[in-house]
Amino acid sequence: MQGRLSAWLVKHGLIHRSLGFDYQGIETLQIKPEDWHSIAVIFYVYGYNYLRSQCAYDVAPGGLLASVYHLTRIEDGVDQPEEVCIKVFASRRNPRIPSVFWVWKSVDFQERESYDMLGISYDNHPRLKRILMPESWIGWPLRKDYIAPNFYEIQDAH
């Protein structure tokens, strides 16, 4: 099922895939990594000037990694915001997605956390480095194929 925003993107020749609606009726769209930055700028200009949250997850062991963005547009009243959920999938072998830091500054720590936990590299992010784990940490703790080090290795890391 195609929503209003998806229809608008089709009308303007912007490539995406509609993933339907979530349980709250928020439209969910899939954008290719190579198209994400330009479409993010278009969303911002169209009025989606608030990035409510960004997160990432491991879709399946050995599968894709996903970066998820929740955008909000408030036009007429604060009590009726328009929201959209964007999913950008990246290959596990070389997970690279353009950073949208220069569009929404609030994504700074969120993209860093996604990098730290899942190893997704956000191209052109000004400070992409670990934010929760020590710089010397090996691996990406929230990947489904991550093998946790034993207690002594964790103790030595502190």
UniProtKB/Swiss-Prot annotation:
Keywords of the record: Chloroplast, Membrane, NAD, NADP, Plastid, Plastoquinone, Quinone, Thylakoid, Translocase, Transport
Gene3D superfamilies the record matches: NADH:ubiquinone oxidoreductase, 30kDa subunit
E.C. code: 7.1.1.-
Keyword Transport appears in the UniProt entry: yes
UniProt xrefs under Pfam families: Complex1_30kDa (PF00329)
GO MF annotations, alphabetized: NADH dehydrogenase (ubiquinone) activity; quinone binding
One GO cellular component term: chloroplast thylakoid membrane
Subunit structure: NDH is composed of at least 16 different subunits, 5 of which are encoded in the nucleus.
HAMAP family (alphabetical): NDH1_NuoC
PANTHER family: NADH DEHYDROGENASE [UBIQUINONE] IRON-SULFUR PROTEIN 3, MITOCHONDRIAL, NADH DEHYDROGENASE UBIQUINONE IRON-SULFUR PROTEIN 3
Protein name in UniProt: NAD(P)H-quinone oxidoreductase subunit J, chloroplastic
Source organism (scientific name): Nicotiana tabacum
